[in-house]
Regions:
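Lipid interaction determinants
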Residues: 1-150
């Protein structure tokens, strides 16, 4: 049991950091790469050494508003242009995956679900990729590139 705990701590240490979002790319079945979240989305993902995580990011350009309170259209634009959840994670070095166990999300249907992501670590960069996901009638792969914050 102690060996498992030590191995878990070592694997968590590899991801444990604050990471800044560099890019989000979506690959369509025909190989076309699109930027659903814009050319320069902003965001953070945090992994801690105890196995907790949180992620949030925002579209580029971000939605703007001149009203307070927001109109229904402005609320919809703000919701569609932002994404966030938190929970715990498992890092599986052997499989090359990290699984996010979602405890709370701005999208209620995600609570209690698990998201498995393929990862690549290189230097100060972390790349997380989804398995193919059905979106807009086609299977798409999402790739998020993060840079370790200094």
């Amino acid at each position: 049991m102690l060996k498992i705990v030590e191995e878990t701590k070592k694997s968590h240490a590899k991801l444990s950091a604050l990471w800044r979002l560099i890019s989000i790319e979506t690959t369509r079945p025909n190989g076309e790469v699109i930027h659903d979240w814009g050319q320069n989305p902003t965001g953070l993902i945090i992994y801690d050494s105890s196995g907790r995580m949180a992620v949030q990011f925002m579209r580029d350009p971000p939605p703007t508003s001149a009203s307070n309170p927001l109109t229904i259209e402005e609320k919809n634009a703000a919701f569609e242009g932002y994404y966030a959840y938190f929970g715990t994670y498992e890092f599986n070095e052997k499989d090359g995956t990290v699984t996010h166990h979602i405890q709370s999300s701005m999208r209620p249907y995600e609570v209690g679900t698990d998201y498995k992501r393929f990862y690549k670590l290189g230097g100060n960069r972390l790349t997380l990729s989804t398995p193919p996901m059905l979106r807009e009638g086609e299977q798409r792969v999402y790739r998020l590139v993060w840079e370790r914050a200094q």
